[in-house]
A protein has these predicted regions:
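Bacterial Sec-dependent N-terminal signal peptides
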Residues: 1-29
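Thiol-based oxidoreductase modules, predominantly thioredoxin-like and allied folds used
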Residues: 30-31, 74-103
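A short beta-strand-turn-helix
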Residues: 31-48, 78
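Short active-site neighborhood of thiol/selenol oxidoreductases, capturing the structured segment around
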Residues: 44-58
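Hydrophobic beta-strand anchors of alpha/beta hydrolase catalytic cores
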Residues: 49-50, 84, 121
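The canonical Cys-X-X-Cys-His
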Residues: 58-61, 121
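Typically the conserved alpha-helix immediately C-terminal to a functionally engaged Cys/Sec
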Residues: 61-77
Length: 153
């Protein structure tokens, strides 16, 4: 009986550990506070990658997320060169953001995305000055990363 209990506990622990690694192993280091994003960028002397997304309704946003943002190539490159912030504008009730985050994202949209383009990818310097911008391109993650780097010039 004790042996069965040990096996059950071990199986549950293994499932939990696997799910934990899958969840956090694939997660991005996306910031949720833009002021902290700017502070980190200044401290680390990095540019800011600001992404306007409609994560649950914008098909090109979802495709960009799956092809580029979730790729290992992007994760590695972002860690080296950028502090990343996603200003998300979900529509489904289940995906709604906190009122504070919604307000913050709205302020960012007023400043950087007045036309309401989705997705909109903006490269900023550490002070928040726009260096360049782009949108969805149906290209590979490495090609999109090069596109972002081209905005640095």
């Amino acid at each position: 009986m004790e042996s069965n209990l040990s096996r059950i506990i071990m199986k549950k622990w293994t499932v939990f550990a696997t799910l934990f690694v899958m969840t956090f192993g694939y997660s991005q280091n996306w910031k949720t506070n833009f002021e902290e994003t700017k502070q980190q960028a200044s401290k680390e002397n990095k540019n800011i990658l600001l992404v306007f997304s409609g994560s649950d309704w914008c098909a090109p946003c979802i495709k960009l997320d799956n092809i580029v943002w979730k790729s290992e190539a992007f994760k590695t490159e972002a860690e080296k060169y950028w502090v990343i912030y996603k200003a998300d504008f979900p529509k489904k009730k289940a995906n709604q953001l906190s009122p504070e985050l919604t307000e913050s994202n709205n302020k960012l949209a007023e400043k950087y995305n007045k036309n309401g383009s989705f997705p909109l990818v903006i490269l900023l310097d550490k002070t928040g000055k726009v260096l360049g911008m782009t949108g969805f391109k149906n290209i590979s993650a490495p090609d999109y990363i090069q596109l972002i780097h081209s905005l640095e010039k």
